[in-house]
Amino acid sequence: MNKLIRIALTFLLVMTTGVIQAEIVIYPVPQGIYYARHNDDYTVKVRQVGEKDWVDLYEYNVKVDMDTKSDATMVQFDFSGKVEVLVQKNNGEIRSAVVRPLSKGIQPEIDGNFLLFTIDKPQKLSVEFNGDRLNNLHVFANPIIKNVPDKNDPNVIYFEAGIHEPTDTAGKCFRIPSNTTVYLEGGAVLKGCLICDSVENVKILGHGMLLEPQQGISVTYSRNVLIDGVTVVNPRHYTVSGGQSTGITIKNLKSFSYQGWSDGLDFMSCSDVMIDDVFLRNSDDCIALYTHRWNYYGDCRNVHVLNSTLWADIAHPINIGTHGNTETG
């Protein structure tokens, strides 16, 4: 199956500007990982408010916390309108539950081993049962993508739903040229990193994922790079690393890591960086800002972090200035 499963519901939202049809979009799961990546701790379903039928979600197993190497759960879907999320806890009773961030003000209803809550806008949530933050459920409710790139455009690299491995077997990476849009369709799983080296005007978009790459996305000696919507699951090194680059924008990125030196977003000698609406759960620094390191030289300046969740199981949510180029006598 290489298309998104799109559920157009009859529920209508009547607005002053007209009538908008509400939707839920779920992603197919490649057969090659369907059983290997599933977590049985929870059964999660969604539906539009006012509808009868529930839509099943696939519960991904994601590793968190370097000390305990715990198995947490992640689900994703796209939606518009207002939806209910139903969670069944499959291993024991629910004595207490909380939906974070607490600033969202979501008060779940509990009935036996079921939990129910409602959302009406895109969210990145942690649902925690009985005080357990290590075996919790992550709910990523994305906005529906309106402008999908044309897969026949010569400047588009389009990854359809399914498993994709790089032809560069030595580096296990996909190298991206200048003036290119890379689109990861929901359900696309890349088993390799994305390399932007000495390029400009690159976009990496979509609701697909990078699964256990050596590193996630590397941006070096480059300018004007946009990363929007992708999920990086358990890379062995950085989720996104920037070196001596300018004009990097990262939006709606989700990241999990559990190994040493598996930072979230690290920037060495980078400028004009915008980080907005990201979820980083890492076992090293979630965000690190450096000047000189390795072969990167120059200032690190004009970095903005907005509307984001930084969850450092190990190390720091933000680390600034550890490395540099000191004078020697």
Spans of features found by a protein language model:
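Bacterial N-terminal signal peptides that target proteins for export
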Residues: M1-L9
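Bacterial N-terminal signal peptides
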Residues: A8-T16
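Sec/Tat signal peptide C-region and signal peptidase I cleavage site
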Residues: G18-A22
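Beta-strand-enriched, solvent-exposed domains that form extended recognition/catalytic surfaces
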Residues: E23-K151
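Extracellular beta-strand-rich solenoid/capping regions of secreted or surface-exposed proteins
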Residues: F117-I119, H164-T181, V189-L205, L211-L226, ...
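N-terminal domain-start segments of secreted/luminal proteins
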Residues: A141-T180
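Right-handed parallel beta-helix
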Residues: N179-T181, G186, E200-L210, R223-N234, ...
